[in-house]
UniProtKB/Swiss-Prot annotation:
The gene is DOT1. GO terms for cellular component: chromosome, telomeric region; nucleosome; nucleus. SUPFAM superfamilies: S-adenosyl-L-methionine-dependent methyltransferases (SSF53335). It comes from Cryptococcus neoformans var. neoformans serotype D (strain JEC21 / ATCC MYA-565) (Filobasidiella neoformans). CDD domains: AdoMet_MTases (cd02440). This is Histone-lysine N-methyltransferase, H3 lysine-79 specific. The lineage of its organism: Eukaryota, Fungi, Dikarya, Basidiomycota, Agaricomycotina. Residues 297-637 form the DOT1 domain.
Length: 644
């Protein structure tokens, strides 16, 4: 019976997988000098004229007809037959059996003959291509080392210091330590005090938007009393009071959710390995390193003080194992997992438990353990030496930490202005003439969008970032911390500009609370960026310029093009509308336009990357490249000289 791979009754027992397919003629007598095949077959560029279906009737050469047949032994006959059947099977290209193959099909050009290698061969590639009749480009094999292998997007390391635990006290407010940040309880009460006074809250009306989370007595609001706990941040002596209540609406600030994420990120990034058995982890997804996981994994790396192989049954230990344990000076690690602080937090917050007293106990244990590693220098030593200042943290993890810290600041000083931002006053009269009414809608680029811009433009500590139309300052602050760049923003509307100033102060205090190293050279300005005195100077320094011009009128985009003529060579412009017209080709009539010095590429942004719509869209990255225009001018001069 014929199958896809040939005659099944004649197949050998063992299976050999191949990474390339080949077509070979029937073996001729080994004595022939015209076609010896000593040793393993070698690659050839010769395409065989016949397929495997015609191997049965392959005629012998003329010289072979006159040669008397020699009588091979039965073993050599068997070996020759097995080799012939092996070649027939390995040379299969998906098609019908040979008996039905037409001569026209047999004359088709076939791929180059390659060396047939088994799956166990060290040089073999994946056998997935064995069923594909199309020739494939050979894969470039890289050295299997962590240095030479290209990491996946987001898996690269940051490569710079992002933690500065020893410098956080330098950023308190007027020497008062940690009195300068807006607390969680102020947001819940809607009564922001101090330098951020007038945060747009409703005072006592805000409390009606919250309800108790824990059902036990003493965990509900009683007049002005709000159930709360104090949590210690990584910075020494920095505590924040979190209200143990939840909002009735998803649009409101959620203190319980923020508290849980605060603890999760601290346990994930700040706890030394020597103390992780005390703190534990609050990872949202399945943690393969968590001993509670019932799923075994090859990716789990044992800790240095753990057993490489699982211990035997304690009820009947083997004599050899018992001898090894008694011979060592340190006791064997316990097979019973101790309950960590994270376990208590997870249990107390479980929807089917909501155990308030247990949660308070867990937070007390956490504060005591965190204070201990702060005071004895363990935490600082781990951040400075163990993590090398955070140089080894992955880009994806670093971006998530930045996103959360900045979201804390946004919730405290910008969230209260949400109504004013959605219904902000119109533009000043002198500006409204140049801007259409549809542009009078406030919108923000989300964190994921700015992370992509940082990656594409390669923003770094030596870069200068300028945001024209910076809103509440989200992108400016993200570039200053996530990329470490000097960042400057310019916003026309008064309400977003005021929120930006508040957010800069709150964000920098949050950096200190989390012991993060951001670039403190951040400025946000209010005014028309076309006439602001600082814009020209910052544009001449800029490496990356961001402008959300999706709804700008053509007149404003023309003004921007004139301003961008001062950008230095290699500077990048990120915009939501292109500055190079579609199908633009340089000629004598347009060689003096701004588009003539740009190299522009189009990219996609995804759903929820912008605040004003939930759909995907396009954005553009243009690079200042004056060499194209210079070459065009030289070619024009050459043509003019030839005409003379």
């Amino acid at each position: 019976m014929f199958s896809f791979f040939g005659d099944e009754s004649k197949l050998p027992a063992s299976t050999v997988m191949v990474s390339r397919m080949t077509v070979k003629k029937q073996a001729v007598a080994r004595q022939q000098s015209s076609g010896p095949m000593a040793g393993p077959s070698k690659p050839s560029n010769v395409t065989p004229k016949h397929s495997h279906g015609s191997l049965k009737g392959t005629p012998r050469s003329a010289s072979e007809k006159g040669t008397p047949k020699q009588g091979p032994s039965s073993s050599s006959k068997s070996t020759s037959k097995v080799k012939q059947e092996e070649r027939i099977r390995l040379s299969t290209i998906p098609r019908t059996p040979a008996s039905s193959s037409s001569p026209g099909r047999l004359k088709r050009k076939t791929p180059k003959v390659q060396v047939v290698e088994s799956e166990s061969s060290s040089g073999s590639e994946s056998s997935d291509g064995a069923l594909d009749s199309k020739p494939k480009r050979p894969k470039v094999t890289r050295k299997e080392t962590g240095i030479d292998m290209t990491p996946l997007p987001g898996e690269e390391v940051v490569g710079r210091r992002v933690f500065c635990w020893d410098k956080v006290d330098m950023r308190g407010e007027w020497g008062r330590g940690w009195a300068g940040f807006v607390g969680c309880d102020e947001v819940v009460r809607g009564n922001v005090q101090g330098w951020a006074n007038g945060g747009g809250g409703d005072g006592s009306k805000n409390l009606g938007k919250y309800r108790a989370f824990f059902p036990q007595e003493g965990f509900d609001r009683d007049g002005d009393f709000l159930p709360s706990v104090e949590v210690l941040y990584p910075a020494k002596g920095c505590r924040e009071k979190f209200v143990l209540m939840v909002p009735s609406s998803d649009r409101e600030f959620n203190p319980i959710g923020e508290l849980r994420n605060t603890l999760r990120l601290i346990l994930e990034h700040y706890i030394p390995p020597s103390h992780r058995h005390i703190f534990g982890t609050l990872a949202e997804s399945l943690d393969i390193s968590n001993p509670l996981s019932s799923l075994p994994s090859r990716m789990t790396t044992p800790l240095p003080n753990s057993l490489v192989t699982p211990p035997p049954d304690p009820a009947s230990p083997s004599p050899a194992f018992a001898f090894e344990i008694s011979a060592t000076s340190t006791p064997a690690p316990s097979t019973e997992r101790q309950e960590t602080i994270a376990d208590l937090i997870r249990k107390s917050l479980a929807p089917n438990r909501r155990d308030g007293p247990l949660f308070v106990t867990a937070i007390e244990r956490y504060n005591s353990a965190m204070q201990a590693i702060q005071e004895d220098g363990t935490l600082q030593q781990w951040l400075d030496e163990g993590m090398n200042g955070g140089k080894g943290i992955k880009v994806r993890e670093w971006a998530a930490l930045v996103d959360f810290v900045h979201d804390q600041a946004y919730s405290r000083v910008v969230g209260g202005y949400s109504h004013e931002l959605e219904h902000h006053p119109k533009h000043p009269e002198e500006v409204s003439k140049a801007i259409s009414g549809k542009e009078d809608a406030y919108g923000e680029l989300r964190h994921a969008f700015m992370s992509k811009i940082i990656e594409q433009t390669k923003l770094g500590p030596d870069s200068v970032f300028v945001d024209l139309g910076s809103g509440v300052g989200n992108c400016v602050l993200q570039a200053s911390l996530q990329a470490g760049s000097r960042s400057y923003g310019f916003e026309l509307l008064p309400v977003p500009a005021h929120c930006a100033r508040l957010q800069v102060r709150e964000v920098q205090r949050r950096w200190a609370m989390w012991a993060l190293k951001g670039n403190l050279d951040v400025e946000v300005h209010e005014g028309d960026f076309r006439v602001h005195k600082e814009v020209g100077r910052r544009l001449r320094e800029a490496d990356v310029v961001l402008v959300n011009n999706e709804v700008f009128p053509s007149s404003l985009n023309m003004d921007l093009a004139d301003m961008f003529l001062d950008l230095k060579e290699g500077a990048k412009i990120v915009s939501l509308k292109p500055f190079v017209p579609e199908g633009f080709r340089m000629n004598e009539s347009n060689c003096d336009s701004f588009a003539a010095i740009l190299r522009s590429t189009q990219h996609d942004y995804y759903r929820d990357w912008v605040s004003w719509k939930g759909e995907w869209g396009n954005y553009y990255v243009a690079v200042i490249d004056r060499s194209r225009r210079i070459k065009f001018e030289e070619s024009m001069k050459g043509r003019a000289s030839r005409r003379r």
